[in-house]
Amino acid sequence: MEKQNETAESSLKTYILENTPARIRERYAHLKDYAQMHTFGALDADVVVLDTETTGFSFNHDELIQIAAARMCNGEIVEWYVTFVNPGKEIPDEVAHLTNIHDEDVADAPDPDTALTGLVDFVGESLVVAHNVGFDRTFVTKRAAGATLKNNIWIDSLDLARIALPRLNSHRLLDLVRAFGGADSTHRADDDVAATCLVYRVLLAAVANMPAPLVAHIADMADVERWNSVYVFKELASSEAAPYSLFKSRKAQVAKVQADLFGAAELRADQEAELDRAKHATSRMFHGKHFWRTTTQQHRNACSSWRCCEYSIIASFRE
């Protein structure tokens, strides 16, 4: 067990940015254990983690070739829905090479409408979690058979990673899995779902370990209808948390460091770097207008919401 912990910590070090303070490295290193020892109420009592594989990236011209979904209750996978999907067209060579899904695998598979009908029945009214959620949500809801899933809350684990783990040098699913000691994904949808199940609970732990006033501050930035992922922050936010104040946060941390015989000047420089990281993480989540022109009106609304969120975050940092 000790050797496994050392290996996990070594993997995590590979993905943490240089000059990250030791206390932050230590906090990141304990997140997986924290996730294993805690539950997170409605956020993991009954959620469906989902991934899809497709013939390409075009929402207009490409089709599903695999759907995988796992129902997770308090950290345990209790039920699966996995199916190949016949796209009605040839699978491009590059996609077959990446996913190891070939034309013969999908030849006798259900068509997209049949597969999506099964998915809708499986998901029900549960929370849905996916990594880079816009891609999967668009592909499963663009047909009438899956359209009702637009009514579910979709949580993007990529959003959570960028906000709660800004000191990682990558927030790709594969890198997050490697950082926290999971098994490598094969780019099959079912493997990606298993990976996302692990990562999602680590990310819940990461948000739960953020300062409660900051979680509450983010929770107030948007409605769930406009930015589904804010549901995580609303659930974890303390109802009695005081408004977030950077000045008070700095003052408290300076006092702690002084008590440990460190210099306050060193801490201030460190915190300025952390603010830059947070602003950068927010800007990475905002893709810009050129991206949203090719997507749905819901995505355009989310873009507008994120612009407001970005300004709000930056303003709070300047207190």
Q: What positions do the PLM features span?
A:
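Conserved non-catalytic scaffold segment of RNase H-like nuclease domains
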Residues: 3-153, 166-187
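Short, flexible loop segments at boundaries between secondary-structure elements
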Residues: 156-166
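Acidic two-metal-ion nuclease catalytic site recognized across multiple nuclease folds
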Residues: 2-39, 201-311
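Acidic, Mg2+-coordinating catalytic module of metal-dependent nucleases/exonucleases
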Residues: 127-144, 168, 172-240
